[in-house]
């Protein structure tokens, strides 16, 4: 679906970028005080751990926004393979590796907004989500991604109670 860039669309999207940045800040805050061992614990009743969830939100945002627009993702392929939809934790991050994931977590929202404003997203491959929603534009993908990150923020908070 083609969208005409208008000031009204810009304002609505600015709010979405702000929501994305805020969700990332909240996720990062949940990591405070946790050890490397704690973020890799998968409590009974859960399918994944905190480290995987953090990697997953980074990867999903990149796949939904960049890959589905026919562009290269801005995170490493290894991270995508380890944390994409349908995977479970197999990777144990070193402190340095997880710091890199946290840097991506916090830096990529600004890059997305800059790229959006620069108009690099010219195409979007329709994507049916597992929720039944069909993403047909970058704008709908950004809104959906914010919903998705809220889910994983809640999962991180729940796991944190058990580690």
Predicted regions and their residues:
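Short, contiguous alpha-helical
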Residues: 2, 17-21, 28, 38-85, ...
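Generic detection of long, well-ordered alpha-helical segments
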Residues: 10, 17, 21, 54, ...
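Acidic/histidine-rich alpha-helical segments that form the ligand environment
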Residues: 86-124, 140-145
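Surface-exposed helix-capping loop/turn segments at secondary-structure junctions
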Residues: 33-40, 114-125, 161-163
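N-terminal amphipathic/basic-hydrophobic helices that include classical n-h-c signal peptides
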Residues: 1-12
């Amino acid at each position: 679906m083609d969208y005409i860039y208008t000031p009204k669309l810009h304002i609505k999207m600015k709010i979405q970028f702000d929501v994305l940045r805020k969700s990332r800040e909240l996720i990062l805050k949940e990591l405070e005080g946790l050890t490397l061992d704690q973020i890799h614990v998968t409590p009974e009743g859960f399918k994944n751990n905190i480290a995987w969830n953090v990697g997953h939100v980074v990867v999903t945002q990149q796949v939904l926004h960049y890959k589905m627009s026919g562009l290269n993702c801005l995170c490493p392929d290894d991270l995508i393979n380890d944390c994409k939809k349908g995977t479970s934790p197999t990777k144990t991050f070193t402190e340095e590796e997880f710091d890199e994931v946290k840097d991506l977590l916090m830096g990529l929202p600004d890059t997305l907004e800059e790229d959006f404003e620069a108009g690099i997203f010219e195409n979007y491959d329709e994507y049916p989500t597992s929720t039944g929603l069909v993403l047909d534009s970058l704008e709908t993908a950004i809104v959906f991604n914010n919903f998705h990150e809220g889910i994983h923020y809640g999962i991180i908070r729940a796991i944190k109670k058990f580690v």
